[in-house]
């Protein structure tokens, strides 16, 4: 699966992930900003919302 991959300080690159999922991590509370994207599906918490997806490629736009 091809996923977008970046943190708040790096620009987005396309990464070929071994696992079949991508994630997009964002703040749950205003200002709602995207904090990162990458491979896999890490758990969210009270402050972070993590949206995971498995297809198609670049699904974590």
Curated annotation (Swiss-Prot):
Species of provenance: Dendroaspis polylepis polylepis (Black mamba)
Record has Disulfide bond as a keyword: yes
Domain of life: Eukaryota
UniProt-listed Gene3D superfamilies: CD59
Tissue expr: Expressed by the venom gland.
Molecular function terms from GO: toxin activity
GO terms under cellular component: extracellular region
Listed SUPFAM superfamilies: Snake toxin-like (SSF57302)
Keyword Disulfide bond set for record: yes
Cystine residue pairs: 3-22, 17-39, 41-52, 53-59
Role of this protein: Inhibits acetylcholinesterase.
InterPro entries documented for this protein: Snake_3FTx, Snake_toxin-like_sf, Snake_toxin_con_site, Toxin_cobra-type
Coarse class of the protein's main subcellular location: secreted
UniProt-recorded name of the protein: Acetylcholinesterase toxin C
Signal sequence extent: none
Family of this protein: Belongs to the three-finger toxin family. Short-chain subfamily. Acn-esterase inhibitor sub-subfamily.
Coiled coil: none
One Pfam family recorded for the sequence: Toxin_cobra-type
Keywords for the protein's UniProt record, in alphabetical order: Disulfide bond, Secreted, Toxin
PROSITE patterns reported for this sequence: SNAKE_TOXIN (PS00272)
Localisation: Secreted
